[in-house]
Amino acid sequence: SKAPLDKQLDLTLLNMSKKSKKPKRSAYNNITRRELIQLAMIRSDNTAARLLCQTYPMGFNRCIDDMNTKVHSLGMLNSVFYDPTGLDDRNNSTASDLIKLASAAANYPEVVHASHQSHLKIKIQRHWFSGNNTNPLIGSRHDIQVSKTGWTTKAGGCLVMLLDTDKGRRVVVVLGSKSTRTRIPEAEF
């Protein structure tokens, strides 16, 4: 969507308690979409990824539909998404499709900026969000343009990186690593 990235989002209605009908306090209230992108990309924050879809201008389901439409328009014909976090076991992709996704992601300045950050520290109201990038190569390798990590029991440790090297643009994809710790050594070359 072309939704504004720097507008603060009022998440009060999303945080309503079903029992008490009163809003629960949320550290994410008054966060911006840009900050949610940073949290989702740098810390692999699943709540942030989910909130990006929950605050999508046309609703959560349309967000998922648009994600699938976008990946298919990129030629990612073996990919399907059921949720924005990657945690749903029905989500599926392939290494060749993820190469296409990484290449397309390089056209989004917010994604590239977040991929370059080795550490995140932002303040939302009185709450600090901080943490290191889930890819420890960020900061030590300056050729990484796009990076995203993931892990589920079914998929194992996963990593996608787009690098601009002296030999040209390269994409590294690691799928099915035994743990989040082994995906990085498997990716280094």
Regions found by a protein language model. Name each.
Residues L13-N15, S44, G75:
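Short, small-residue-rich loop/turn micro-motifs
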Residues D6, A49, Y108-V112:
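Internal amphipathic alpha-helical segments of the cytochrome P450 catalytic fold
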Residues Q8-K22, D88-D89, H119-I122:
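Acidic helix-start/capping segments at beta-turn-to-alpha-helix junctions
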Residues K18-Q54, F129-V146:
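Conserved catalytic neighborhood of penicillin-recognizing serine enzymes
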Residues K2, R43, L51-L52, L74, ...:
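Short alpha-helical scaffold segments that flank and stabilize functional sites
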Residues S1, S17-N29, A105-H119:
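Short N-terminal secondary-structure initiator segments
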Residues R33-R34, P57-F189:
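Penicillin-recognizing serine hydrolase domain
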